[in-house]
């Protein structure tokens, strides 16, 4: 093929990447959504943290430049893309292999079954706007207000497998196997408010502390699209065009509002937070697929994609023509403990599983530790572990550093591996950058 399937997919999903669960930006790639006043991103995870991310003697805190986060995740199928590329070549040109037809059928029917069960590619991307998040401590009842905005995205690619067959008379291979791509583009702006709501007395296990409460409203514009692309139409020269065209034609945009609330108990040496996200469970519709195929021009990729979708909808029931994504209400607890003035540890856990916008199940556990240094060049280092407790059940090691007291760089490296081009590679990998005021 002139263009490998992997490269074509990365190019073609560019317009789509521009979801929700999937990637934490800035230092929260390592620490997760924990209640740490050192990170401005904490105010975007728990609205009650809006009161804590600005020091007492300050009134404002901002993020200088856009924050960025991206990660990818691969299914547990070795040489996923190599096998798909080779199969597309054989279907397009049977003379590209010298193996007997029986061997090709035995090999690829086994491979297709494996691809259908475990083969997938998922990617997530987030961008925050310059200056935002912006948090202001007011003089009114020690309350704080915050505003944040950004672009979040996600795509998920899976294989809808079908048997490979051989026509002895024509000497050709054929299969209804198709690629199933779901993607979304979310643009949002969030307003948050928080204030102290209770002074807590000294207890046997805690010093006097303060309980903060917060709430937020997030206006969301979410574009969702899904498509089915038969691999027989992917000849390697127009993969990007086919996927991009179908993304546009199946696109549907929905606008809704998500409300969240949270509390943080601050006792100085440690903090405990509780977040209740998407209280109203907002809904967003995907564009329909596999409908009105007769109205599309015959012998075109659009017609083939529509008919392939209709087949898997009507005969197999593996996908649905019309689908609604619900951002289900979910809860999370987190904690932060300071061993010393420089060394701390944090953790957070989702209390229930939920689906991201491309249908993958998530329930994340984050553990991290951070050490602060007395220098301006490398003021902090952090190391973390995150694990999806359901769904794909993958785990990753995360590391990060703060640079020059305003920049953050964090990396994610999966602990599970697969094979790509004969070499071992992590099934998850991510990177996050941020530039914000740090105190």
Model regions: which residues?
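Subset of outer-membrane beta-barrel
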Residues: 19-439
């Amino acid at each position: 093929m002139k263009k490998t399937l992997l490269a074509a997919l990365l190019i073609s999903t560019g317009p789509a990447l521009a979801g929700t669960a999937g990637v934490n930006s800035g230092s929260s790639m390592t620490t997760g959504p924990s209640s740490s006043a050192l990170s401005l991103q904490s105010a975007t995870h728990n609205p009650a943290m809006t009161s804590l991310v600005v020091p007492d003697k300050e009134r404002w805190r901002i993020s200088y430049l856009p924050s960025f986060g991206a990660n990818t995740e691969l299914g547990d199928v070795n040489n996923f893309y190599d096998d798909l590329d080779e199969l597309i070549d054989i279907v397009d040109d049977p003379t590209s292999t010298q193996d007997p037809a029986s061997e090709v059928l035995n090999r690829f029917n086994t491979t297709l079954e494996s691809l259908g069960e475990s083969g997938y590619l998922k990617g997530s991307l987030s961008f925050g706007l310059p200056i935002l998040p912006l948090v202001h401590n007011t003089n009114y009842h020690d309350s704080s207000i915050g505003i944040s905005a950004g672009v979040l995205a996600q795509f998920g690619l899976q294989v809808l497998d079908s048997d490979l067959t051989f026509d002895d008379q024509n000497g050709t291979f054929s299969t209804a196997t198709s690629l199933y791509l779901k993607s979304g583009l979310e643009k949002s702006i969030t307003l948050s408010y928080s204030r102290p709501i209770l002074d807590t007395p000294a207890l046997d296990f805690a010093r006097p502390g303060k309980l903060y409460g917060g709430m937020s409203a997030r206006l969301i514009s979410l574009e969702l699209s899904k498509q089915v692309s038969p691999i027989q139409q992917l000849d390697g020269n127009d993969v990007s065009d086919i996927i991009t065209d179908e993304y546009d034609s199946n696109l549907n945009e929905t606008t809704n509002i998500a409300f969240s609330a949270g509390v943080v108990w601050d006792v100085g040496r440690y903090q405990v937070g509780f977040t209740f996200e998407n209280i109203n469970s907002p809904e967003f519709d995907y564009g329909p697929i596999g409908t009105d195929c007769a109205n599309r021009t015959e012998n075109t990729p659009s017609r083939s994609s529509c008919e392939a979708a209709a087949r898997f909808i009507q005969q197999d029931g593996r996908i649905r023509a019309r689908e609604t994504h619900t951002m289900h209400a979910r809860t999370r607890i987190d904690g932060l403990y300071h061993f010393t003035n420089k060394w701390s540890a944090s953790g957070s856990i989702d209390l229930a599983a939920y689906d991201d916008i491309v249908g993958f199940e998530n329930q994340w556990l984050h553990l991290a530790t951070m050490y602060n240094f007395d220098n301006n060049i490398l003021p902090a280092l952090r190391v973390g572990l995150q694990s999806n407790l359901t769904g794909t059940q993958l785990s990753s090691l995360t590391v990060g550093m703060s640079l020059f007291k305003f920049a953050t760089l964090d990396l994610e490296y999966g602990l599970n591996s697969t094979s790509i081009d004969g070499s071992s590679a992590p099934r998850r990998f991510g990177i996050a950058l941020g530039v914000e005021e740090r105190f």
